[in-house]
Structures are given as structure tokens and as C-alpha cells.
Regions:
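Functional surface patches built around histidine and acidic residues
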Residues: 2, 8-252, 257, 266, ...
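Acidic, low-complexity Ser/Thr/Gly/Pro-rich repeat segments typical of extracellular/periplasmic
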Residues: 226-229, 233-335
Length: 335
């Protein structure tokens, strides 16, 4: 009788350890991709955004059916064609317009919108998607628009995973709905809004109230310590992973801001050699005149309290804004 050749230690390790481990990891990866419920993830993403807006002292975003429809259509489209904010494939069943304003109008939303989104090859939860957007400077500033008070979100898993948030102002929506009627009036002010994708002048006796308090972020607790460099366009295109950007923005019709000093410190001292972005130094020319950001040269420490200080002049007077935040704890030992 022919005897079989004994297996080598390498073959035994491959058969009894590495192959089962690989099968287990693949199975876990597969299950992690199918466990998501799109409606629940969309709601979780919007809830997470409202959590961050509340920590920043802003009003939460109420669900709006038209904005949700616009977000759903675009997320459906992105799950097949990952083109960002543009749509070029008119034959796609969910195509409703080339740009966010056209798509919002097609969904029945008359006012201007801000659209933010993530696209990935693998499914990410709505909460994780929102947290990622909040570390991306340009997206964050739009998500924290203080006059916005309604939104719609959608999460879709197709060839690609897409998460989309559309947000707007109920006050502007109502003014757009009355634009034709108000156009007959003789009024003191003329307010220009984006209505149904077109610039529209609306006569008003009184202008809507403006949010004049600066919006600061991060603020509060459980803050991600880093920015991964994946925002498009990238505000830090030549750097390795850096600190979660610290931003301050002044909204409304305000006098220009002159920056004197922007610092970030912890109990270990002031962060050295930060990158300060302003409208003048922003490599992508995305920042507005009264928007400012500070990037630490490397990720911030976990579970650490930081204090940001922004010293500036406005209308000939010097002011100081100071706020604190604490980074989150490590989630696992790989971090």
C-alpha cells in the first residue's frame, strides 16, 4: 500500500490556520456590507449631523420630503455613476438634473440648497459618513450653515455606496413660493435668492434676521482627531494625515474680519507650525472672506482637551473668540 507523504509545517499552517482565517474575514466583510438598512442609515446620518450642529450652537435640521426626494434621486444615481455633484448620464432612471439646484427644483423644492455627499467602494454607516464629512473643511462649512433648518438624506448601496445630504432654509423656500406675488410690491429692500435654480429678486419691507454669531468647530466632546486628506478638492494637498481642522466662520452681511492670531493648545502646550487657511491662502479658493481654518501638522492626540483661540479685528475693534473641545478615545488598538 502506498503511503502518503507527510505534510510540511508550512502546508499545515496554511490549511488549518490561514485559510480558515481568510474565510472568516471574508465572511465578516460580506456580512458587514449587507447588514445595513438604507432608510435607517440615512436617518442616522442626518441625526448625527444634527448632533454636531447642536454642539456648535445651531438649530437642528427638520426632515423635508422634497429635499429627501432630491437626495434619494442623486444617491441612486451615484450608486452607479460616482460623479460627485454633477450628473451627465441622462439615461439613468434617477437622473433629474445636472446640478444640485436643478435636481432640488425637480423634486419640488423651490429654494437654494447645499449638497454634501460621500462615495465609497465599500458600505459605510450613515453616522460614519457624516463624521467623515465633518472632518472635511469645505463640506463642514456648508453643513454648518446657520440659516438652514431643513434637510433630506439618503443612503444607497449599489455598485458604489453613496450618502447624500441636501439642506436648505424654510424661510427662503416660503419666500420663493411667494416671489411672483411679492414682485408686485414696492418695498424698501430687494432680496436676491436662488429660486427654482434661477436668481430671483424679491421686494421686502424687512430683511430676514441674520445669524451674526461666529460658528466654531470642533466644539464639545468625542471629536475625531485627524483629517485623512480625502476631501475633493483637498485643502491640504501636499501633506500626510493632519489634525482635524479647527474652523471659525462669520455669516451674514458683516464687516470684513482681520485675523491677528489663531492658535490651538493642549495641556502639553501650543501646537507648533500649524497651517492657517484664509480666503487669500486657500489653495482651492473655496473659503469665503470671513472663513478661517487651522490645521495641526499631525493628528491630534486621543482623549485630549484642546483650546482654540481666534484673535481678530472688526470695525476697528479687537475681539477674541475662545472655545474648547475634547477628542474621542481610541476605538481599538489598531488606531
Amino acid at each position: 500500500m502506498k503511503k502518503s507523504r507527510p505534510q510540511s509545517p508550512l502546508i499545515r499552517r496554511l490549511l488549518y490556520f490561514w485559510l480558515p482565517l481568510a474565510a472568516l474575514l471574508l465572511g465578516m466583510g460580506y456580512l458587514s456590507q449587507i447588514r445595513y438598512n438604507p432608510a435607517k442609515e440615512a436617518k442616522a446620518g442626518l441625526d448625527r449631523l444634527n448632533h454636531w450642529r447642536t454642539q456648535a450652537g445651531l438649530q437642528p435640521l427638520a426632515p423635508n420630503a422634497q429635499l429627501q426626494k432630491a437626495a434619494q434621486n442623486h444617491a441612486n444615481y451615484l450608486s452607479r455613476h460616482p460623479e460627485g455633484h454633477d450628473e451627465t448620464q441622462r439615461s439613468h432612471p434617477s437622473y433629474t438634473g445636472a446640478d444640485p439646484q436643478t435636481r432640488a427644483a425637480a423634486a419640488g423644492y423651490s429654494a437654494g440648497v447645499a449638497e454634501n455627499l460621500t462615495i465609497s467602494n465599500f458600505a459605510r454607516s450613515g453616522r460614519t459618513s457624516t463624521d467623515s464629512l465633518m472632518t472635511a473643511l469645505y463640506h463642514r462649512l456648508a453643513l454648518l450653515t446657520p440659516t438652514h433648518n431643513e434637510a433630506g438624506a439618503a443612503w444607497v448601496r449599489g455598485k458604489y455606496n453613496a450618502f447624500v445630504v441636501e439642506q436648505g432654509s424654510s424661510q427662503e423656500r416660503e419666500l420663493c413660493a411667494q416671489a411672483s406675488q411679492l414682485a408686485q410690491n414696492r418695498s424698501r429692500y430687494l432680496l436676491t435668492l436662488l429660486c427654482n435654480g434661477e436668481r430671483t429678486s424679491i421686494p421686502l419691507n424687512e430683511l430676514p434676521p441674520e445669524h451674526l454669531a461666529p460658528v466654531k468647530f470642533p466644539i464639545g466632546n468625542n471629536i475625531d482627531p485627524s483629517y485623512d486628506g480625502k476631501e475633493n478638492p483637498n485643502p491640504m494637498p501636499t501633506r500626510n494625515p493632519v489634525g482635524n481642522p479647527v474652523s471659525i466662520a462669520f455669516y451674514g452681511n458683516q464687516a470684513p474680519i482681520t485675523l491677528h492670531r489663531f492658535t490651538l493648545r493642549s495641556s502639553h502646550g501650543e501646537i507648533a507650525n500649524p497651517t492657517i487657511l484664509t480666503a487669500a491662502s486657500d489653495p482651492n479658493h473655496q473659503l469665503q472672506t470671513n472663513e478661517f481654518a487651522l490645521f495641526a501638522p499631525k493628528p491630534l492626540d486621543y482623549n485630549t482637551e484642546y483650546t482654540a483661540q481666534f484673535v481678530y479685528s472688526q470695525n476697528g475693534k479687537q475681539h477674541t473668540e475662545t472655545w474648547t473641545f475634547r477628542t474621542r478615545k481610541k476605538r481599538h488598538w489598531f488606531e
